[in-house]
Regions:
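Acidic/charged, solvent-exposed loop-and-adjacent secondary-structure segments enriched in E/D, K/R, S/T
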Residues: 91-113
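N-terminal mature ectodomain segment of secretory-pathway/periplasmic proteins
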Residues: 24-95, 126-133, 139, 146-154, ...
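N-terminal leader/targeting segments and the immediate start of mature chains
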Residues: 2-5, 16-67, 104, 122, ...
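Sec-dependent N-terminal signal peptides
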Residues: 7-13
Length: 314
């Protein structure tokens, strides 16, 4: 009897093993993507598409020891360039004064999914492997990132089968409608890209932007009573616009972000306003003498619930 029980336990373990391994595979592929985007030397030409616009870029990434160099350049219209040298990111744009900020990465035009902590994200999303495809002449693994609630969007990622790099990322609404797409057209991987660092080091570093605001210690007189599970406060700040103080707070779950703005309501302001374009929702509502505005990558229903959950402290 004991032998039979032991045999059944062994067979059950063998039966369950492939399913466990398969369940772990998507997150392993996603973690491989994050590491590849951080550590490899590569050049991407890609397009960023929304329902109303399309822009093309070239992104180069080089890692020398522990220092990262990167360059993002627009390929249409007037050239705009962003250069990363270690923890300094410099912006160059025609007609505007160049400046530098303290940052360990270029975030403009690149999807947030490449910077995500997938272990944390797994608490609020499911990762589903869909199979193979082909992007930019290369075979890719396709993974769907699906929220466990109805308060955020979903993501479809296409990862290079050989090196793990992200070659396409689709942000989709709950019905599968495309909101935003990152799509690589050409990919070049070569350690000889390290020669680009000579050029990047020769470019003068523009003045460092004043970052004297103490965001972490700023106290505001309002709070959010409801947020979708997994969203945390990233930063909060105060700005002065047209002589009026505007308080803002940035929130993120690691994949999607939104900002709440609170300011004194104008006497002519509409009680409620809603605007939607692509992945972005703008929703504002007047409460007493305050106007609360949501701007971010969440559905309108979620934006409305967040705004209506803001309460003011006495």
């Amino acid at each position: 009897m004991k032998k039979t029980s032991l045999k059944l336990t062994t067979l059950l373990g063998l039966f369950l093993l492939p399913f466990t391994a398969f369940a772990e595979e998507p997150i392993q592929s996603l973690n491989k993507m994050s590491q590849a985007m951080r550590d490899l030397n590569y050049e991407l030409a890609f397009v960023q598409t929304t329902p109303t616009n399309m822009d093309s870029f070239r992104y180069r990434h080089i890692k020398q020891g522990q220092k990262v160099y990167a360059q993002l350049v627009t390929l249409d219209g007037e050239q705009q360039e962003i250069i990363q040298r270690g923890n300094l990111v410099s912006y160059f744009q025609p007609g505007s004064r160049a400046f530098t900020i303290n940052s360990g990465e270029i975030v403009d035009a690149l999807p947030a999914v490449i910077r995500t902590d997938f272990s944390k994200l797994s608490q609020n999303y499911d990762f589903i492997k869909l199979g193979k495809d082909r992007i930019a002449g290369r075979f890719v693994d396709t993974i769907r990132i699906v929220p466990k609630d109805d308060f955020r969007y979903q993501y479809l990622v296409f990862l290079d089968e050989e090196n793990g790099l992200l070659l396409r990322g689709d942000m989709l609404d709950r019905e599968g409608k495309l909101l935003d797409q990152f799509r690589v057209v050409t990919l070049y991987i070569d350690d000889r890209l390290r020669g680009l660092t000579d050029y990047l080091n020769k470019v003068s570093v523009p003045p460092l932007l004043n970052e004297s605001k103490q965001e972490s210690s700023l106290a505001v007189n309002w709070k959010t009573d409801w947020l979708p599970q997994g969203f945390d406060l990233v930063s909060q700040n105060q700005d002065v616009m047209d002589g009026e103080v505007v308080e803002n707070a940035l929130f993120s779950d690691g994949l999607f972000t939104f900002t709440l703005y609170v300011n004194k309501a104008d006497s002519t302001a509409a009680t409620e306003n809603t605007w939607k374009q692509g992945a972005y929702t703008i929703y504002s509502e007047v409460m007493g003498d305050k106007e609360i505005t949501f701007i971010g990558q969440l559905p309108i229903a979620a934006a409305k619930r967040i705004v209506q959950g803001v309460t003011f402290l006495k």
